[in-house]
């Protein structure tokens, strides 16, 4: 089971006041990661961290900008979710998709601890697609940002009809919210992942 969570913001969302001008009471959010020592986990696209055997991988560009983040279960060797932001600038189409003919199309994640992944690509030849969680099409504004989406840590195995059907349709729909909204909505905060808590829900 794969899931999607999205939120959006506009320029008035962080005013901290109600429509009457009175300061609103801050409610303690049980899903907050503010006690976590990693600043990236405080960003709005992050869900509550699972913790335990999971680790956080945050991919940055050479500019220092965060491209996307992953919660990875080291014992199950599986992605729990990938979260990222899309806005007008980072969905620009400046470079083509990484070629299908690239001999290293799905590289191992350089941020992985040595014991965190398989020693081979478990999806190649399995009958499943390499299903992007942060889509390649959402990261065509630079060669570096697009190439990072092909790391195996950003994949979940998907049946082709699903990956090329409803999943791709959903990805396209998310992009239209930014391109159509223009200045009324400036950012979408997206988190997508699969269910891996029960045996049989992840590859071994």
Give the predicted meaning of each segment.
Residues 5-9:
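C-terminal motif of bacterial Sec signal peptides marking the signal peptidase cleavage site
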Residues 10-204:
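Domain-level detector for secreted/extracellular nuclease and nuclease-toxin modules, and
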């Amino acid at each position: 089971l794969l899931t999607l969570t999205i939120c959006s913001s506009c320029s008035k969302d962080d005013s901290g006041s109600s429509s009457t001008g009175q300061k609103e009471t801050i409610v303690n959010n049980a899903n907050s990661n503010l006690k976590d020592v990693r600043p990236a986990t405080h960003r709005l696209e992050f869900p509550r961290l699972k913790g335990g055997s999971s680790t956080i991988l945050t991919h940055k560009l050479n500019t220092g900008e965060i491209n996307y983040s992953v919660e990875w279960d080291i014992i199950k060797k599986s992605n729990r979710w990938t979260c990222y932001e899309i806005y007008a600038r980072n969905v620009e189409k400046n470079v083509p998709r990484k070629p299908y003919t690239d001999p290293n199309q799905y590289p191992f994640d350089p941020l992985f601890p040595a014991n965190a992944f398989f020693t081979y690509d478990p999806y190649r030849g399995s009958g499943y697609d390499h299903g992007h969680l942060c889509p390649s099409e959402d990261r065509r504004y630079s060669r570096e940002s697009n190439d990072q989406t092909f790391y195996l840590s950003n994949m979940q195995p998907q049946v082709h009809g699903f990956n090329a059907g409803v999943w791709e349709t959903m990805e396209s729909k998310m992009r239209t919210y930014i391109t159509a909204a223009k200045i009324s909505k400036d950012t979408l905060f997206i988190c997508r992942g699969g269910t891996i808590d029960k045996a049989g829900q992840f590859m071994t």
